[in-house]
Amino acid sequence: MEGFAKPSTSSGSGVTVRASVAAASIEERFADLCKAKLGLDESTTRQAMQLLKETNNILKSSMSSLGGGSPEEIERFWSACVLYCVSRLSKAGRSKEDGSVSLCQILRASKLNIVDFFKEMPQFCIKVAHILTGLYGSDWEKRLELKELQANVVHLSLLSSYYKRAYQELFLSNDGKSSDNSSESNNQEASDYYRFGWLLFLVLRIQTFSRFKDLVTSTNELVSVLAVLIIHVPVRLRNFDIKDSSYFGKKSDRGVSLIASLCEKHHTSEDELSKALEKTNTLIMDILKKKPCPATSACQQDNLSFIDPEGLTVFKDLLQGDSLKPSLIILEKEYENAINTKGELDERMFANDEDSLLGSGSLSGGAINLPGTKRKYDVMASPAKSISSPNPMSPPRFCLSPKGNGFCNSKMAPSTPVSTAMTTAKWLRNTVSPLPSRPSGELLRFFSACDKDLTDDIAHRAGIILGAIFTSSSFGERICTSMRSASRMDAIWTEQRKMEALKLYYRVLESMCRAESQILSGNNLTSLLSNERFHRCMIACSAELVLATHKTVTMMFPAVLEKTGITAFDLSKVIEGFVRHEDTLPRELKRHLNSLEERLLESMAWEKGSSMYNSLIVARPALSVEISRLGLLAEPMPSLDAIAAHHNISLGGLPPLPFQKQERLQDKDEVRSPKRACTERRNVLVDSNSLRSPVKDIIKPKLPPLQSAFASPTRPNPAAGGETCAETGIGVFFSKISKLAAIRIRSLCERLQLPQQVLERVYSLVQQILSQQTGLFFNRHIDQIILCSIYGVAKISQLELSFKEIIFGYRKQPQCKPQVFRSVYVHWPPRSRNGKTGEDHVDIITFYNEVFIPAVKSLLVEVGPGASASPKKKEEEKGPADVGPFPESPRLARFPNLPDMSPKKVSATHNVYVSPLRSSKMDTLLSPSSKSYYACVGESTYAFQSPSKDLKAINNRLNSVSGGKKVSGRLNFDVVSDLVVASSLGSDRDAKPAADPAKTTPVKCEPSDS
């Protein structure tokens, strides 16, 4: 379990002294890291030391939940996280001239890799959030830009892999496979050309975009670099025959059409590639000082043989002879000047497979949803690795070795995230861009058929909301360059994306109005088309699809919600309709919307500030007290005038909308978007209809019309038998929660090989909790309830299943996030038995014992193996939609029952004994019938990796030095707490025979992993 176990010594003063020595040692090592290895100035070092000291107690309690390795490794993680926060949040850290350091420097000095850093940094932020708020203000998370930096790393890793595959397909490399007769000098020459292309792309990327580093535009720039290489790299290094290569399929009478062929190969447009190539040529002239050859000259004739020169610019001696080395030096200097000003990452490392910073694993992790085929690095479950570098501050090396890591894979896949993004962008370019930027004639007729012509109001609103989303301030505060060309590109980019979102909004709105008019048998859609929240949701959904298509780094979901003033729960009401009414929507964008809806259902709709609570207090008045006590209600939705003023948007002389003030009075469901990430999904949620639900009274088989979905929660719904719109909406929402829970329960239970009846009991328990103990979902993740339900049902079913095993299975689930079981929200009542009060975050076992079991113990009894429902109750639970239980699952593979015995020596070289868990204070606190519900105090949520890695972790704990003193008295197997082991070692002969754990023991004891 998370946290340090209590020491077994009886000397309190001795413990204090050792803790002080350990803290002093950590501070000494941290000071050496700041001054000797990183060369920080006094001001930055002082701020870093302050943050380290204030978080020291949290570090001690996080030894089992951060990094997963030795205490020394966890300390290095913590130090790196502290330094990154200080470098980004402190005033001195905003400029490199003021003594700040980049993330790359921090990681090299700490001997960590970037993948492991991004795995652990979110945990650090959760644990020290209140301290960071006190030191740096409430907006520290936005200023930290952690998600944006992670997205940028993911994009660069994908682009580097894409570039590597394309280069190796076109040119000889230094891997020894393309040319058996190539000499060492030729290999180095090939590597230099590869390096030139990547550096040219990086400089172009910095010069062109100050903020909007989206994946699609970056890919266009990368393809333009390939075009430059094709016509300038010496012919002897080509890996293709220009006349016969299938790579160049577009030909004319004058030869191969290079631009058209590259567009066909890389799914871009000739117009976009021509513009990108023009910018690349301009950069070569401005920075490398190369002059283009006249069209009639004879330069580069060998390279242009059988190539149509139209639209191409050739530079004399750009990559010939002795000109390559000087060009590399100039590009290196240009790039270094840029990253030394504001850069966090030395992006040159992505062209080097062997760079120690890259590591292995996935950086997507749910926060960044990149479409495409299954990636090699989908799951990060391995313990963090210590990465050494011979010279931490040395520049990265470049290589073309096919030996890839998590970032580079030399095997050309049929579909990659980059190629998928380019294909999706093609849909936007071919289907949406040609549409008019004004409503069609049919849509105008719907607007004019309302009680009042709403044409001007709708156009007015769209201008303000899209202006709020697509502004320079929306895409971060940091600018990589002050070049005017970058600012011009920003303005062009935002205007293009804004127009695409506007056209998509009008297109889908027309289709929705057509369908709604058929449902209502009339064209008067005043109730829907005058609803402020509905239009904002539609605009937000359109903008999100445009941003998701281009894979922007800085405007990832849920940024559009905050800009539009809505919540994720609001947006979920239009997601299904949006997908249904846009037939041409690509599969990847449908998946994106589905994933957003799933993220909403699993956690974001339950967060503080969700408009769901405003409907829930109407549908379930009994919950209003708890909702108010926790402060969960949403804030009012900001007016259009407020949004326009906040983003400095001109209103264009249009008068304020007449219905805005009325909306504030009528719609009590208005909210401002929560600041934390939130998201949604739908497709998979409608596929599971085979489950009996004890809450069928709140689940409706059909979705209501949009008018009722966006009506005031207290308004009666005429199509639902007199119930309020809130009851209808909550019923639909709960039905989706039930289906999502069913899918995840089935998946996890089958992975754990649990029996069929256990699977159904778990589902029944979750349904009962949703119906009768809804408050357990408040501010929590649905998976936290599922994990606890599985363990509780396993306990009452007398199964040999530990929380550790459940977490190990959960780690393999595609939606797994470590925060789910490491940090569970609790709000301690004034008289809690542990003495704590107020808000807190605990591990899942503490939540299970302290909150979950007291709330659901009676429900567990009802779903237990001895429970028997009356025939009448069974008949009530069986609805017309019932089509049977879960399909048969694999049977449980039971663990052997081990006899209880005296302490057993488990090591030949160490005096280490393991004894079965004995009675504790819980014996006196729990009745015999209640003991079987609780989780073992010493149980861990840390999943094992493999026998060898587990033994290595045990040895690290045995041999580790903490605070200068070797740990010799206690052994943490991560299964039983140190206190239990110590008490067991103190009494060797008092063991009792094993008994049925469901009847006599307060907790389930587990055999050691050793």
From Swiss-Prot:
It comes from the Eukaryota. It is found in: Nucleus. Residues 867-889, 986-1010 are annotated as: Disordered. InterPro entries: Cyclin-like_dom, Cyclin-like_sf, RB_A, RB_B, RB_fam, RB_N. The keyword Transcription regulation applies. One of its GO terms (cellular component) is transcription regulator complex. Residues 728-858 are annotated as: Domain B. Residues 416-858 are annotated as: Pocket. One of its GO terms (biological process) is cell differentiation. Residues 617-727 are annotated as: Spacer. Residues 416-616 are annotated as: Domain A. Keywords: Cell cycle, Nucleus, Repressor, Transcription, Transcription regulation. One of its GO terms (molecular function) is RNA polymerase II transcription regulatory region sequence-specific DNA binding. Regulator of biological processes that recruits a histone deacetylase to control gene transcription. May play a role in the entry into mitosis, negatively regulating the cell proliferation. Formation of stable complexes with geminiviridae replication-associated proteins may create a cellular environment which favors viral DNA replication. Belongs to the retinoblastoma protein (RB) family. PANTHER family: RE32990P-RELATED (PTHR13742:SF17), RETINOBLASTOMA-ASSOCIATED PROTEIN RB -RELATED (PTHR13742). This is Retinoblastoma-related protein 3.
